UniProtKB/Swiss-Prot annotation:
The keyword Signal applies. It holds the Pfam family Peptidase_S10. It comes from Saccharomyces cerevisiae (strain ATCC 204508 / S288c). This is Vacuolar serine-type carboxypeptidase ATG42. Present with 1420 molecules/cell in log phase SD medium. InterPro entries: AB_hydrolase_fold, Peptidase_S10, Ser_caboxypep_his_AS, Ser_caboxypep_ser_AS. Substrate binds at residues 418, 475. Glycans are attached at residues 163, 242, 339, 371. Changing residue 474 to A: Leads to partial block in enzymatic activity. Keywords: Autophagy, Carboxypeptidase, Disulfide bond, Glycoprotein, Hydrolase, Protease, Signal, Vacuole. Disruption phenotype: Leads to vacuolar defects as well as defects in the terminal steps of autophagy, when PCR1 is also deleted. The PCR1/ATG42 double deletion also abrogates the production ofphytochelatin and the degradation of glutathione-S-conjugates. It is found in: Vacuole lumen. Belongs to the peptidase S10 family.
């Protein structure tokens, strides 16, 4: 997740053509509705700049094109990636684009499982932002290799494709190698595009339709994944592919509840010592109540404006005090690394950007775009000005559970921005058919079957599981690769309660 740079956010909001912005912020003092705010605030007409691209010829003869059987305006380009050229992995790989006419082009990279690709599950991985590339997951967290300082791949023995085939999709439009003339600035629109991609993918790989299929991601994927799963449940009731579960790591899914847990996390109630003074903690605690009122107005409104205001206030009041400490918003244990990419705090992400901009890498993958960036500010700004970040998506998690589709909410317990306290809280308050039974379950130790070490805490009832992972920040696979792999292997094997098999029935 690319956290909101507070100066950047405030500059954007000040650019709104409104004579007295303070008049809008006076609403924070009471529970006044936003009945007249639509007339008072005027959003810029163009909140997302047109992409400036250096494009290659996408009529590349190395691509095979599959035309959608449902809508011929959509197609999927597919090419084999020679594993020996890049050395990311030795397994079979494909890359390409989903195209919509000449206006939208979504890039993906697909890796077969290292184990049994004909029968192993398939996982779609999504990073967050909004506006950040899923190649962060591929080349920095959980993929077959990471990129070293010498720009060479480093084999990852804990890759999630050890026992699953992995799809890394660059979405929404404008992220990474994806491009187009249209603008996508809401989770709802992004979800529709991702769903169509999945339909086309399984048309191109029909032998995989019966395999278990999981959607996984982190951070802002806590928005994306519920929306995509909702699209599948609503539009694909006969399941032309087999949606088996979803997994969300350190996600932002229910902003109203999660915002209440910044102060506890910063002030010593999340298992780590306080990083703010008692005075700052008291001030933040008071601000949380005001943030909650604004988020309630956002949830109740059909307009984006209350959500934009909620985002601006809550981030200023609840993120800025923490950011001023100099600590990493993704890992409360220390500051950002030196020489890291802008706003992302990790030097290794700079290596990924450099690697993906090598002409030989782009040529091997068949990219239509020469300029790669791990996070796109235009996409981020577009989502900001729809208020998307403050909108709720937990209702679609309830929909999945009520359809008996398993959901895993996992969280590294040293993250601040999407911390484990907030994720535990919203999952506990989720309205679904077995809410009360789930609430009665207590967190219990999650113990490694490999080492016998306690890796975290787990809570489960039926299809719903919450997992706290010790000593991991925002990106669990990066901080705890062994635990991350054990987690995903257990989950996709059907052990939803993360229990010893002898006690699994009682635990679930």
């Amino acid at each position: 997740m690319k956290y909101l740079n507070l100066v950047f956010v405030l500059q954007l909001l000040i650019s709104i053509k409104y004579a007295s912005f303070g008049r809008a912020f006076s609403l924070f003092e009471d529970d006044t509705t936003f009945a007249n705010l639509d007339k008072q605030l005027k959003l810029p007409q163009n909140t997302q700049q047109t992409l400036k691209l250096d494009r290659l010829n996408h009529d590349d003869p190395l691509f095979t094109t599959f035309i959608s059987s449902v809508d011929t305006d959509y197609s999927l380009r597919l090419r084999t990636v020679d594993p020996s050229k890049l050395g990311i992995d030795t397994v079979k790989q494909w890359s390409g684009y989903m195209d919509y006419k000449d206006s939208k082009h979504f890039f993906y990279w697909f890796f077969e499982s290292r184990n049994d690709p004909a029968n192993d599950p398939i996982i779609l991985w999504l990073n967050g932002g909004p506006g950040c590339s899923s190649f962060t997951g591929l080349l920095f967290e959980l993929g077959p290799s990471s990129i070293g300082a010498d720009m060479k791949p480093i084999h990852n023995p804990y890759s999630w494709n050890n026992n699953a085939s992995m799809i890394f999709l660059e979405q929404p439009l404008g992220v990474g190698f994806s491009y187009g003339d249209e603008k996508v600035s809401s989770t709802k629109l992004a979800g529709k595009d991702a769903y169509i991609f999945l339909e086309l993918f399984f048309e191109a790989f029909p032998h995989l339709r019966s395999n278990d299929f999981h959607i996984a991601g982190e951070s802002y994927a806590g928005h994306y994944i519920p929306q995509i799963a909702h699209e599948i449940v609503v539009k694909n009731p006969e399941r032309t592919f087999n949606l088996t579960s979803v997994m969300i790591g350190n996600g932002i899914t229910d902003p109203l509840i999660q915002a209440d847990y910044y102060e506890p996390m910063a002030c010593g109630k999340g298992g780590y010592h306080p990083v703010l003074s008692s005075e700052e903690c008291e001030k933040m605690s008071k601000a949380a109540g005001r943030c909650r009122r604004l988020n309630k107005l956002c949830y109740a409104s059909k307009s984006s404006l209350p959500c934009i205001v909620a985002t601006a206030y809550c981030d200023s009041a609840l993120l800025e005090p923490y950011i001023n400490t100099g600590l990493n918003v993704y890992d409360i244990r220390g500051p950002c690394e030196d020489n890291s990419t802008d706003g992302m705090c990790y030097t290794g992400l700079r290596y990924v950007d450099q690697y993906m901009n090598f002409p030989e890498v782009q040529e091997t993958l068949g990219s239509d775009v020469h300029n790669y960036s791990g996070c796109d500010n235009d996409v981020f700004t577009g989502f900001l000005f729809t208020g998307d970040g403050s909108k709720p998506f937990q209702q679609y998690i309830a929909e999945l559970l009520n359809h008996n589709i398993p959901v895993l909410i996992y969280a590294g317990d040293k993250d601040y921005i999407c911390n484990w306290l907030g994720n535990h809280a919203w999952s506990n308050e989720l309205e679904w058919i077995n809410k009360r039974r789930y609430q009665r379950r207590m967190l219990r130790p999650w113990v490694s079957k490999e080492t016998g070490e306690e890796l975290g805490q787990v809570k489960n009832y039926g299809p719903f599981t919450f997992l706290r992972i010790y000593d991991a920040g925002h990106m669990v696979p990066y901080d705890q690769p062994e635990a991350s792999l054990e987690m995903v292997n257990s989950w996709i094997s059907g052990n939803r309660a993360f229990s010893d098999l002898s006690t699994l029935e009682n635990a679930s």
